């Protein structure tokens, strides 16, 4: 029995040698190093067609807010201050000075907007809604009812509203019902 267990462990360890590493993933797309700050990528796969004789009639989606500004001012100030001191000391390379300039612009743009939805975040939800509309037009015909819910966090509400605005641009006859309130505890992880 011990030999069987050792053989199985050896087999799995050999198979793991063929697995992708984080380093390989980052070489393909450095932005993935941003972890949960990585902007939502557009899908690159095609949809599976509906089975013969079947047609879409309903869509249910659960989404997180789009890209947002960092939550704390310090998350902008810390790298800015490091780069400022290095720049003032003449220790930055040409590339370092460019990074310092970009960090300065980002810091200024985010000022007093900590945690709010970015323009990219709003655009992401319009794009998601447009893909739903393009992929399943029959669901959005005529006076179809759209029932949307959000947490009371403003970036979530604005994300939802951007998606709804995009859908109504495609079909102004849609009946939209949207709501955001603390009574919807299931959206708040039960903490509402």
What do the predicted segments below correspond to?
Residues 1-22:
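Bacterial Sec-dependent N-terminal signal peptides
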Residues 21-192:
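Long, internal stretches of domain cores in catalytic or enzyme-like folds
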């Amino acid at each position: 029995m011990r030999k069987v267990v050792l053989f199985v462990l050896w087999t799995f360890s050999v198979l793991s040698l063929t697995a992708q590493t984080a380093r390989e993933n980052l070489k393909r797309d450095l932005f993935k190093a941003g972890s949960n700050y990585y902007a939502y990528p557009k899908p690159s796969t095609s949809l599976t067609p509906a089975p013969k004789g079947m047609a879409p009639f309903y869509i249910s989606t659960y989404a997180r807010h789009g890209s947002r500004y960092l939550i704390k001012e310090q998350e902008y100030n810390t790298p800015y201050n490091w780069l400022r001191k290095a720049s003032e000391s003449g220790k930055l390379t040409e590339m370092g000075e460019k990074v310092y300039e970009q960090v300065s612009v980002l810091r200024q743009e985010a000022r007093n907007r900590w945690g709010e939805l970015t323009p990219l975040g709003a655009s992401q939800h319009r794009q998601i809604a447009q893909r739903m509309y393009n992929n399943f037009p029959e669901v959005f015909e005529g006076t179809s009812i759209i029932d949307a819910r959000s947490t009371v966090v403003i970036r979530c509400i604005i994300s939802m509203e951007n998606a709804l605005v995009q859908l109504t641009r495609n079909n102004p006859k849609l009946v939209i019902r949207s709501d955001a309130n603390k009574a919807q505890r299931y959206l708040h992880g039960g903490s509402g």
